[in-house]
Amino acid sequence: MKYLKVYLLSFFLLLNYLKVNSSDNINDIKSLLEGRYELVYWTENKIQYDYPEVAGVLVINDNNALITMDKNMNSNKSVELIGWGRYKINSNSFYIGWHDWKLLMIENNLKTVKKKSPWKGMREYSVSLKDDKLVLTSVTGKQSWELDKKSLVYSDKEWGEEKDEVIRYWKRIQ
């Protein structure tokens, strides 16, 4: 009976330790993820574009997401985007989806509006936290977010209809 009490006490202490560390872990993850970001540059097919050719704002906070982007890399074609979404995160997984998406393309003075989200439902990512760096990797391995206290680097190996490889560097503004 004495040993049973010791084992039970040890078990409950271990559970409390894991619960506290799990809570601290999710707080560390959220502190790196949540914030406001400004797009600094965009690399598409190994060509870097800076402001004013590209501009954008990303806000991730309290399970809500907002993104705006302007892409003016070609004088005859521009793309403007605004999206509202939701996300969920825990210490193992991150999910994000865009339930309201508006993409305005202007090419040779012709305007086209697309209101379809780039994917259905929520995209799933694995979560890795190491040395004050948060890495989110999609289950396909084609998209990733790397976040620290100063920045977010988003990489996509198949972005858009043309399936271009892009890297977007965002600085944290709050």
Task: Show where each model-derived region lies.
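Bacterial Sec-dependent N-terminal signal peptides
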Residues: 1-28
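Lipid interaction determinants
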Residues: 20-174
